[in-house]
Each structure stands twice: as structure tokens, then as C-alpha cells.
Amino acid sequence: MNFDFLMQHLLKTSMVALLALASQTAMADNEGNAPRETERETQGITFESKNTDSKLLQTMKPTINFGGYIIAKYSISDRSGQATNGGFDLRFVRLYADGHVFNDFYYKFQLEVNGAPGVDKGPRVVDAFMEWQKFDFFRVKLGQFKRPFGFENPYSPLKVGYGCYSQATMKIASIGDRNGEHKSSGRDLGVQIQGDLLPGADGHKWIHYQLGFFNGQGINHADKDHHKDLIGGLWISPIKDLAIGGFGWNGKYTNEKYDASNPNHLKSVKRVRWGVGMKYESDWTVRGEYMSSVGGVVTNAAAPDRSDAWYATIGLPVIKNLKIYGRYDCYRDAKTWSSLRTDYGISGNYHLGKNLIFQLNYTFTDDRTARRAATRTDSRYNTFDVQVTAKF
């Protein structure tokens, strides 16, 4: 069956059902006129316009919150044949401002300021969007923000619980996409609708949906073709803090550096992906996903055009402020067992007060592709890293 036809049919059916549910939710929801609470990565500093004589400010009711965080890292590996065995790294330096205007509109602007300057490197905008949040069951977001694909992708680096995202989130949910797209941190330019439906007795919503149209070229890049990426997700929450659902992505990426004289280059590659997963986030954390991808690599015409990945993460509190995470993390670049790379990881996260996080990570890697590589190197190796996060 044609994939585009199937996606359109499913989306039409889903939207009819969601609109019916939304009408019921609107009658049950008493919070429609209140600004939606927004979970921030850091506490930051908030300013509000109060006791002003300006009629415009009284109408706008603007608030603004400033914050940010720094993540510094030291890593060491015993893998042979590498240019370096590790070292110090400034993983993230991010600054943001967010807030509300006219009560119902939430905005966010976030900069990443670490890294050497260059094309798609160094200081750059990662988030710049506004969202209309008048109703829980229907919200509209416009600008540059996270693609709605996968449970882990929307997570801040501060919440993942491990020293990096899973390979599924990195390679297929587009934190660092396998297809050759510049580093976009899982984000793109576009518009998205989303909402939460059917409130339960304890206040949690049973159904969440999200659907967006995007350029498909990643952050800070204009559209380069006549195709828009369609990305969506739908999940249910039978109990508070538990979500079970799936995601779909029908898109295309255009090679902005295409060279017709280079036989390794592809002008564009399709990005047809789907995933299923679950998450439970409370004192305990349980999170797992499977993702599958169809589409090649624009810088390597010979690269496989099918890949998949899966992971399982568990986190348990040990003592106050200390949480231990374990992760089983797999990626198959060619969707074959001979292309499997598996990371077995364990991490300790200790929070010292509200603004400091100390993290110790260990990873054992088993990379089957290294056993068949032209340049031989260790296929099994160990990596340790220490990360310190300061929030402000």
C-alpha cells in the first residue's frame, strides 16, 4: 500500500476522532482560561509587569524568565586506534528567556553558545517559538522547536539521566541525524498542534496527540524543496506518569551541498520513520522505545537506506538526591545483526541543592561493524566520563 495514502487516511481518521474527544474535553476542562504551566529546565529569574499605569502592559500581562545551564565533561576510553583517548569538553552552554504575554501565549528563545564558530557550529539559536495555550485540548506552536518524534527527544539534557541521549534518539529522532543533516538537536522550523484529552479523576489526561509540519532542513535553515515533513505522535496514559504510544514521520531531506560531480553525493533522501515506546517518570524512571527508518545518507550514496534502533532505560532512587540509571542501547545502521552496535551503560546522578548536578557514567560498547571495518580497531571497549552541571 502507498505510504503517503496510508498516512493521509490515518491522519484524517485520527483528526475526526480527536475533534470529537476535544468537544467533550472542552466541557470538562475548567482550566481553559488559565495560562498553562510550563516546565522549565532551570529555576531562573522571573520578572513580571505589576503596578503599572500602562494600559498596554496591563492588557499584555507580560512575564519573562531568564536562565541557563553549563555542562562540563571529562571522558576517557580504552579503545585503541583513536586519535585521542578522551579529554575535557564543554558539552553545553545554553541561555534562554521565556514567558507569557496576553495570558495565553507562551514564548521561548534559547541560545547554545559553546563550540568554535563556523557553519552550523558555535553560538546559534536552538529554540525560537511562540505557542497559543488557551486550551489544554488544542494548542498551536509556531517557530523553531523540537520535532514531535519519540519520547526522549523532547527531554532536556538535564532530564535524560545518562551522559548522552540514546542512539535511537541521536540517529533516528534527529539529535544528530544519520542522514547527513547538520546538527539540529532534534529541532526544525514549522508549525504544530497538540493537546491533552479526557481528564481523569486525579487530574491527569488520558490521551495526548501532536502533529506538525516542518521544513525538513533542521534548525536555522530555510526550506530547500517543495516538500514538507509531516511528523506526529499519539499516546495514552492509563495512569498518572505513564505514557504508551507511537510516532510517525513522512519527510525528505535535501542536500544543501550537493555536488553532481561527486558520486558519493545524493541530491535528497527520504525520511520515512516510525516508532513505538513507553515512559514512566516519577521517583522511578522506566523508558523504552523502538524506532525504524527508511532513507539514505546524502553524503554517502552507498550507505544503507534502512536502519533501526531500540533502548531500555531504568532509573531508581537510592538515597535523597541520588538516582542510579541503567541503559541497554542498540542501533543497527543497516538493519542487520552484523551492523549492530550495543551500549550497556550505568550512571549515577547526584543533585547538590537546586543548581548543581554531578554525574558519573560508564559505558561498555560492543560494535560489530568494527570487526569488519577496513581499518581494524577495538570492537569492544570501555568509556568513563564525569559531567558537572551548573544551572542558573
Model-derived features with residue positions:
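Outer-membrane beta-barrel transmembrane domain signature
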Residues: 117-119, 202, 220, 240, ...
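Outer-membrane beta-barrel "beta-signal"
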Residues: 350, 364, 378-392
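Detector for outer-membrane/organellar transmembrane beta-barrel domains
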Residues: 51, 235-334
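Outer membrane beta-barrel
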Residues: 52-219, 224-231, 235-244, 313-316, ...
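Transmembrane beta-barrel architecture of outer membranes
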Residues: 90-92, 123-127, 188-190, 227-233, ...
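N-terminal periplasmic/intermembrane-space "pro-region" immediately following the signal or transit peptide
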Residues: 3-7, 13-71, 392
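Outer membrane beta-barrel transmembrane domains
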Residues: 315-317, 321-355, 359, 363
